[in-house]
């Protein structure tokens, strides 16, 4: 059986915390797509761990971890992240991580190109993390990329990397500050070190499913950053939703038991792109400060605003959530009134639009229709059960459930691992 944890907004919803809570029951924890642009922190046994490329199931000493075939794999970050986890006391991490031999390699070359492409775009820049994720997927789709298994054939590896570098050099000239021979030299060491981690992930996952293993899959980024369904072109370069999980891990869709959408009690976004409920006044600043809204991967401050239920309903239609995890509800503790977007409106006709349009110009022209709900004006972090919560907080939760049509089974009430209320467990298949 498999449980999926997927971001329902623009990322940074708090997926890692739920992964940490659920992974003690999992035998395998896997990532399907994305790269080391993703980032989240987990606090376990009083220690904070940062994850970017690695699955956060590594905090569970009894869990195997897999990086799936649709991930773009930055080799230096892989080893660096493993070392940092060891330094913080996690043991045996090298024996509990595997990497699909079908992953495409994310080179330092790709990061250099990423920065130049952002400069080319000027005012239309995407606001990428600068980690080379987009260029890595571009070379993958152009069929000029290098896969993990090709690292072990030195002749093929060096020829393909030199060809890739030559193509970019032709495009960018002296603006490209990159030495292909230096990167080739580094991979002579990586070639030896990587062998123990590389696996045929298709066979590995098939055997795990056939044996009935409990598999926990953590999505990277979120649905609104999906290359097909997000606010294109202000998106990442992979499929971040349900479809990307099935493709990236070759998982049997009939063996997926739970699809848990993680949704922050308000909304944040990093980088450029549409954000209809963004608040540039006092409320947005307050959310940013209380919520400590700056990125694990980049340190950039996140844009903040109210919860957008149009976005959540759209996300639900694509990912088919069976349950929701509402996170960071405690950040709203001191708000007298809480606004929630329930529709968009055409200012010319007054007609309400309840869907999320593909055309960003149309989206930009629409006004937001808000519903105002009363705040609870008291701390909730010490609440351990649903009915410990103030009635206003429960009303907020139930309004979201009714609007979206999906039960909220997990409620985050603080930063610690134990600050999570579990309810409606009948909606979750064990």
Swiss-Prot record:
Q: Please list the GO biological process terms of this entry.
A: 'de novo' AMP biosynthetic process; cellular response to cadmium ion; IMP metabolic process
Catalytic activity entry:
IMP + L-aspartate + GTP = N(6)-(1,2-dicarboxyethyl)-AMP + GDP + phosphate + 2 H(+)
Whether rRNA processing counts among this entry's keywords is no
Indicate the principal place this protein occupies in or around the cell.
cytoplasm
Q: Which residues bind Mg(2+)?
A: 12, 39
EC numbers listed for it are 6.3.4.4
Quote the CDD domains the UniProt record gives.
AdSS
User: Which residues act catalytically here?
Assistant: 12, 40
Per UniProt, IMP binds at 12-15, 37-40, 129, 143, 221, 236, 300
Alphabetical UniProt keywords: Cytoplasm, GTP-binding, Ligase, Magnesium, Metal-binding, Nucleotide-binding, Purine biosynthesis
Listed GO molecular functions? adenylosuccinate synthase activity; AMP binding; GMP binding; GTP binding; magnesium ion binding
Enzyme class (EC, first level): ligase
Localization terms from the record: Cytoplasm
Q: What does the note accompanying the cofactor annotation read?
A: Binds 1 Mg(2+) ion per subunit.
Superkingdom as given in the UniProt entry: Eukaryota
Q: Mind telling me which HAMAP family this protein's record contains? A: Adenylosucc_synth (MF_00011)
Q: What does this protein do?
A: Plays an important role in the de novo pathway and in the salvage pathway of purine nucleotide biosynthesis. Catalyzes the first committed step in the biosynthesis of AMP from IMP.
The record's family statement is:
Belongs to the adenylosuccinate synthetase family.
Q: What is this protein called?
A: Adenylosuccinate synthetase
């Amino acid at each position: 059986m498999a449980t999926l944890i997927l971001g329902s907004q623009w990322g940074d919803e708090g997926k890692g915390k739920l992964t940490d809570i659920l992974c003690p029951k999992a035998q395998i924890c896997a990532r399907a797509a994305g790269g080391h642009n993703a980032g989240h922190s987990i606090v376990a046994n009083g220690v904070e761990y940062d994850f970017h490329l690695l699955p956060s199931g590594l905090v569970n000493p009894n869990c195997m971890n897999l990086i799936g075939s649709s991930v773009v794999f930055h080799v230096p970050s892989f080893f660096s992240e493993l070392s940092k986890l060891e330094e913080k006391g996690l043991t045996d991490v090298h024996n509990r991580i595997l990497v699909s031999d079908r992953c495409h390699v994310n080179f330092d070359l790709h990061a250099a190109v990423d920065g130049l492409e952002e400069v080319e775009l000027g005012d239309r820049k995407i606001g990428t993390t600068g980690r080379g994720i987009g260029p890595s997927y571009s070379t993958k789709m152009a069929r000029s990329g290098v896969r993990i298994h090709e690292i072990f054939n030195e002749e093929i590896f060096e020829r393909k990397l030199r060809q890739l570098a030559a193509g970019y050099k032709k495009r960018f000239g002296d603006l490209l500050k990159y030495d292909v021979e230096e990167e080739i030299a580094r991979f002579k060491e990586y070639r030896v070190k990587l062998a123990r981690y590389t696996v045929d992930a298709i066979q590995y996952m098939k055997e795990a499913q056939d044996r009935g293993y409990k598999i926990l899959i953590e999505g990277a980024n979120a649905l609104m950053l999906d290359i097909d369904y997000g606010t294109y072109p202000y998106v990442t370069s992979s499929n971040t939703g349900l479809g990307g999980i099935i493709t990236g891990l070759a998982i049997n869709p009939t063996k997926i038991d739970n699809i848990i959408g993680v949704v922050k009690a308000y909304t944040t976004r990093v980088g450029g792109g549409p954000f209809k409920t963004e608040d540039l006044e006092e409320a947005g600043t307050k959310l940013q400060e209380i919520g400590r809204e700056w990125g694990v991967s980049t340190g950039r401050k996140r844009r903040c605003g109210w919860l957008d239920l149009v976005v959540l309903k759209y996300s639900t239609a694509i990912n088919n959530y069976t349950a929701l995890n509402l996170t960071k509800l405690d950040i709203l503790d001191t708000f007298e009134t809480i606004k929630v977007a329930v529709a968009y409106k055409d200012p010319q006709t007054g007609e309400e639009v309840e869907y999320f349009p593909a055309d960003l110009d149309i989206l930009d022209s629409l006004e937001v229709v808000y519903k105002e709900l009363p705040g609870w004006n008291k701390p909730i972090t010490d609440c351990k059960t649903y009915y410990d919560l103030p009635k206003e907080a429960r009303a907020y939760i139930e309004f979201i459930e009714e609007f979206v049509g999906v039960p909220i089974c997990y409620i985050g009430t603080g930063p610690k691992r134990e600050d999570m209320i579990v309810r409606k467990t009948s909606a979750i298949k064990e």
